[in-house]
Regions:
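Lipid interaction determinants
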Residues: 2-69, 82-211
């Protein structure tokens, strides 16, 4: 277990790791809102370091180029985890909270979500796919503001910025792009996607945390 290397000014003072989530890669099996299954076509990857996390969701309306991602830090206060969205591709840097029940295979998260100005109960089932002996969280700044978060865990590297997100998988020592989306309007040449990937490749990443 490593110590925090860098407490940035935009960090969450109350951030607190949840031991059962530290160093985990989780994939969502399903989501229910008001007991109805939703977002069946959406693939979700959640990588957790200690307090830093990334959550990348792609495939809305069965379009792999449509996504939502957020990243930040968690605060664990049994049985609840509060997720602080320090970066959110939808622009909403608030927080959300869920109560967790842990199982041998993963965890069940329940809470409330607002849809069309109505507060509704939700349930998400998460499958734990990996326990990593070493997970590293990095941050990139721009004008003393948090600009991007990257988490490296086993074969996976996931990056989130305000304008999009990317997931890379190590294939025999080569990082290959697995999924990417950008919030910028689609352009014929894919310039916004290329610009996003260039940014992730060239950003000045600083180690924020290891697990």
């Amino acid at each position: 277990a490593g110590a925090c290397c860098n407490t940035p000014p935009f960090g969450v003072p109350s951030a607190n790791a949840c031991p059962k989530l530290t160093g985990k890669r989780l994939v969502r099996e399903y989501m229910l809102i008001n007991d109805a299954k939703v977002e069946d076509s959406v693939e979700v990857l959640w990588l957790q370091c200690k307090t830093w996390f990334v959550d990348i969701r792609t495939g809305f309306n069965e379009d792999p180029g449509k996504g939502w991602a957020f990243a930040g830090q968690i605060e664990w206060e049994e049985p609840s985890v509060t997720f602080y969205h320090l970066i959110d591709t939808d622009g909403d840097t608030g927080s959300d909270c869920g109560s967790f029940v842990f199982t041998n295979l993963g965890c069940l998260e329940v809470g409330e979500v607002i849809r069309d100005n109505v507060l509704l109960p939700f349930e998400e089932k998460w499958l734990r796919f990996a326990d990593s002996s070493s997970t590293r969280a990095f941050i990139a700044e721009n004008d003393n503001q948090l600009a991007a978060v990257k988490i490296q865990q086993a074969k996976y590297t996931a990056c989130v910025s305000k304008i999009g997100a990317a997931i890379y998988v190590d294939q025999g020592g080569v990082l290959e792009l697995d999924r990417v989306f950008t919030t910028r309007e689609k352009d014929t040449g894919g310039g916004s996607t290329i610009a996003l990937l260039d940014y992730f490749a060239s950003a000045h990443w600083q180690l924020a945390e290891t697990s």
